[in-house]
Amino acid sequence: MGLQFRILYAKNDGKDGTSVFDLPQTANATGFCGSDSSSLTLTFHDDAFNVTFDFVKSARRTGASRFHVSAIEISYTELSSFFPGTKSPDGRRQVKNNTMDIFSADADKSYMCNTDMNITVTKDVSILVRKVQLQPFGVKSGQFSWAQVCSQDSGDKGGVNIAAIVIGVIAGVALLAGVFAYVIMSEKKRQDYRSLNSD
């Protein structure tokens, strides 16, 4: 899974700056797993940055349970190496969105998406997520369960199927048009032949 953070911040010169940085491979992952809720916290750059994803499991009308990310919280320090010219060097910030409904899948499956997704946490903070597979509940032997693919990925496959259907319909219409043209031409030749015989 790849995460890229984009954070707007105030600069000394009165202008706005944009800090863009990736989740390093050395990030530390912690969390907890409950029966209906779980969380994943990623900590990196000597605890200067923390991002927490809260997952919940809920029953649907069909009786099947599903999970999704319900909240994302990001706390960070405005380090000058990531926030050049910041108005608040070493200032600590915290943002949270409790109204998220992303990364949804059946509770007994994993969620997988290869398409890049831009997640808006607040008006000033967003996360670009790349090639994600996650499963907050029911992990067995450290392995993901069967993956439920996101609509963005399955939509691409659906586009291929639609193209095949359209080509098939066009070929069928062309074949029918050819058959009708042959029947009409045959009937016309037959009528011309009869009119010659009657003379």
Predicted segment positions?
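Non-cytosolic ectodomains/luminal loops of secretory-pathway membrane proteins
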Residues: 1-149
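C-terminal single-pass transmembrane alpha-helix
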Residues: 150-199
